[in-house]
Design a protein with these regions (language model features):
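Alpha/beta-hydrolase fold nucleophile elbow
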Residues: 139-151
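Short beta-strand/loop motif that positions the catalytic acidic residue
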Residues: 207-209, 214-220
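Hydrolase active-site cap/lid region
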Residues: 154-210
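Membrane-embedded segments
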Residues: 57-134, 150, 154-155, 161
Length: 272
């Protein structure tokens, strides 16, 4: 192979690589936020929850589900879902978690579940803060709120919980940062300089002062288990974990998990 041909091949490969970088850079948010995917269990609600709409700072109405516990408790579970699918995909969790003496608010992000808007990191933070404001208008304060973050929702949870006295946090399949997650899925790309939405949970978790329960499947191939372990390691006490030998991204809601959840709820009651 002569020198000029070698140079041509190198230039062609470089051009293809740059095209890939350009494509991923311009499409990154459509790769990260996938509201159209419906890949989790659908289950009908077995509790008398109502559909509500929570208005964010852009006046976008976020379709949400609110369950008011008959005990009239102020304790409220606020749920932030992950990057894929509608809120209906999480009804099976609400059904299980309604066993506790708490209200439940499950919100959907902008552009998800039929909502208007375009998702961004700052946008999701705004949606989350709007949900907290909605609860506060119902005389439910931060100290009454347990925040549940699922996958991408864990990063929103950690951001919102910083230096705030929430009743507790539940993190399902948390990741250290979107940079680390992107490196795992796209190891051949310079994601550190490409990413618009970085979600730096590993830098923020030290600022969380609420009790934390972290659950993660050891065989998770979307968010590697080591990331959940790292977040647990960095978290302040009191903290507890449920690391289970499963190969799914989200953990199975079985008796073992619910037993650990029972212990966490006992912890946050006693922590007061």
């Amino acid at each position: 192979m002569n020198y000029s041909l070698t140079i041509k091949i190198i230039l062609i490969l470089l051009f293809i690589y740059l095209l890939i970088i350009f494509y991923v850079y311009t499409k990154q948010r459509s790769l990260l936020y996938v509201p159209q995917i419906d890949n989790y269990d659908d289950e009908l609600l077995i509790i008398p929850a109502e559909k509500v709409f929570i208005e964010n700072s852009l006046n976008i109405k976020l379709r949400s589900i609110f369950y008011k516990h008959p005990s009239n408790t102020k304790t409220t579970l606020l749920m932030f879902h992950g990057n894929a699918g509608p809120i209906e995909n999480r009804f099976y969790k609400i059904n299980k978690l309604s066993k506790y003496d708490q209200n439940i608010l499950l919100i959907s992000w902008r552009s998800y579940s039929g909502n208007d808007g375009e998702p961004t990191e700052d946008g999701l933070y705004d949606d989350a803060r709007s949900a907290i404001k909605w609860l506060e208008e119902k005389n439910i304060s931060k100290k009454d709120i347990i925040i549940y973050g699922e996958s991408l929702g864990t990063a929103v949870t950690i951001e919102i919980a910083q230096n705030n006295n929430f009743k507790g946090l539940i993190l399902e399949a948390p990741f250290t940062s979107m940079i680390d997650a992107a490196k795992f899925h796209y190891p051949y790309l310079p994601v550190s300089i490409m990413l618009k939405d970085k979600y730096l949970s590993d830098k923020k978790i030290k600022n969380v002062i609420s009790p934390i329960f972290i659950m993660h499947a050891i065989g998770d191939d979307i968010v590697p288990f080591r990331m959940g372990e790292k977040i647990y390691e960095l978290a302040n006490s009191p903290k507890s974990s449920y690391f289970v030998d499963e190969n799914e991204h989200l953990v199975t809601y079985d008796e073992n998990l619910m037993n650990m959840m029972d212990e966490f709820y006992e912890t946050i009651i006693n922590y007061e």
